Curated annotation (Swiss-Prot):
Membrane topology type: Single-pass membrane protein
InterPro entries hit by this protein: PSII_PsbN
Designated name of the protein: Protein PsbN
Gene: psbN
Function: May play a role in photosystem I and II biogenesis.
GO cellular component: plasma membrane-derived thylakoid membrane
Keywords: Membrane, Thylakoid, Transmembrane, Transmembrane helix
NCBIfam families: PRK13183.1
Species this protein is from: Synechococcus sp. (strain CC9311)
UniProt KW 4Fe-4S keyword: no
Transmembrane intervals: 10-30
Pfam family, any one: PsbN
């Protein structure tokens, strides 16, 4: 098998990092850690 090019390795690394950050953001927004998030609109009654 031919060794992969450096560009393909970098592209896969960037894609993995973006998918990881997206997954972490969704988990933080909708998973169990979301119970600790504050809603700024509820904090300021008009």
């Amino acid at each position: 098998m031919e060794s992969s090019s450096p560009a393909m390795s970098v592209a896969i690394a960037v894609l993995a990092a973006l998918l990881g950050l997206t997954g972490f953001g969704v988990y933080t927004a909708f998973g169990p850690p979301s119970k600790n998030l504050d809603d700024p609109f509820d904090d300021h009654e008009d």
